[in-house]
Amino acid sequence: VSLIATLARLEAVRAGRAQPAATVRHRHVAERPLVFVPLTTAGEAGAPLGALIGTDRDAPRLLAVPQPRDRDLRFAFLAELADVILPYIDSYADTVEAAERSETDPETGKRVKVEVELCADAPQLIVPSRAGIDFVRLLGRSMRFRRTAEQDPEAPHPAPPRVPLLGRWLTHFGERARVPGSSLLLALSDVLARHWTTGQSSLEDQHLGALLAWIAPPEGVSGAEAALRAELARDAAGQLECPPAGPATDPAFDNKLLAPAIERYDRARTALAAAEDGLEADDRLGALTAAEQHIRALVEQCTRPTWEKVWDGLDLLRTLPEGAHVAERWTRDRWSFTGHRDRVLAGEPPQPRRDDAVTAANKLATREREQARLDAQEALDDPLVMAGRRLAGEAFAGEVTDVAMAYSEGRRPSPRPLVTVRTDDRPHLGERARAYRSLGGKPQSAEFVGFAEDGAPEEGGPEADGPEAGGSLIVLRILDKMGRGKEPEAGSVPEKGDHLCFTLFEHEQRGGAKLPDPEQTPWTHGGPPGEESVPETPDPVTEEDVL
């Protein structure tokens, strides 16, 4: 945990409410996000119980599974879910704009610019907490390999037509959520905790009600008291006043309300199956419908408070101005969405259960690169985040006290001005360390020369590792972004009196070495493939799949 985060947490405890951890919003929030509040059944991994879903706060769609162990009812739930999510996704897939992308020419092997389609916008899925993202991944894995009756007429339990397609999309959303800075699938608790620091632990921040209680406590109540009430307060029936954000449910809800309701539904269904005439069947059908409606009411009772809190959290996030680099990261999400749309339209098979060596290495490299890029961009966008980097010795800010023109040695000398900066920060500067500042949106690099004292610079070395080694005057040599001429271009060199901020981390991340194609991968890493790969089959049917 960084020093500034610890200080903010202590300040939140002292003040009794959450403290800002950012001055701008570092994640994209769509105008019309799809909010998904799922519930699962205790005792069986991934068995859906119900959900509230929709893009309109006042008109959510309620989905429920009266008997979660019944495979047919599960498929009916997934089909309803597909009827909501897929039209929402399709509404973004058809509106495109022209864009340029660099691709390798197969004939020449050179990188060339090609014009391609890019979706003008992309869908955004919001779940209450990190566990919701895990559930989306689990749903995607369980659905994308299912076979429909059209694909396999002899399948014993064919899936509804659009269920496998929904599984592919949910898998894509879940994989994209692993990329730092992506906003296609967001856990609201994580986003709120990124922008506000509470007086509780990061694990407790996963409780959406407690987190919002710290950020916006009721009048006259401290954040700690409001959070404790959100976590523990129960009504006269012993039910939590603020149900968990899901997808797991509260044991008291399961034991006292849900289990009796499901037993009532099972009895009504058994009675309907045993009806001997039409009149008796009509009466028992009414009892079955009433039992089902009761379960739907329980699901809504458990999800509605979370639904309202998710929209409250989105309203809080919208009060913050968007960071300068958020649009750039959202554009990468749009490229990702467009690429998956094209793969689906091209008829490619579902994503495999396990990535091959090259794909896995590429994913890991992408995530590492995007994490470094996100850390740098958040600091450049937000003075409060930059303050944390300065406290950590990874950046420094100060006033330019002197600029001395100097030139490089060689046949064609280039300008290499020496800039002296007075700072109160204590950056971790080593010999010839690089520093960077933002100049017109591009990074300008400089080299650490040494600490200056009484106007004379001391050459930096291992022993010159802080202001105590030579005072708080830092001498830097500007290296680039000054034009091609003998004299620097106007505005490219700092002037005396300028207030600057230099970072010791790079602002832009370079791509790594290109990995071989799967056909060229050594056998030690899973290749080359001996025969053509075949589409993966669904998970085997177990006793738990059928009631």
Regions found by a protein language model. Name each.
Residues 1-122, 135, 142-176, 180-181, ...:
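Long, charged/polar, low-complexity intrinsically disordered N-terminal extensions
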Residues 7, 284-429:
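Accessory interdomain/linker segments of ATP-dependent helicases and helicase-like nucleic-acid enzymes
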Residues 38-42, 127-130, 423-424, 439-440:
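Structural motif
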Residues 42-47, 131-136, 405-410, 427-428, ...:
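Flexible loop/turn segments at secondary-structure boundaries
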Residues 50, 416-419, 472-474:
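Short aromatic-glycine-enriched beta-strand elements
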Residues 115-128, 133-142, 146-346, 444-474:
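Alpha-helical structural signal
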Residues 430-434:
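Loop/turn positions that initiate beta-strands
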Residues 435-440, 445-448, 453-454, 458, ...:
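C-terminal effector modules of nucleic-acid-centric enzymes and ribosome-associated factors
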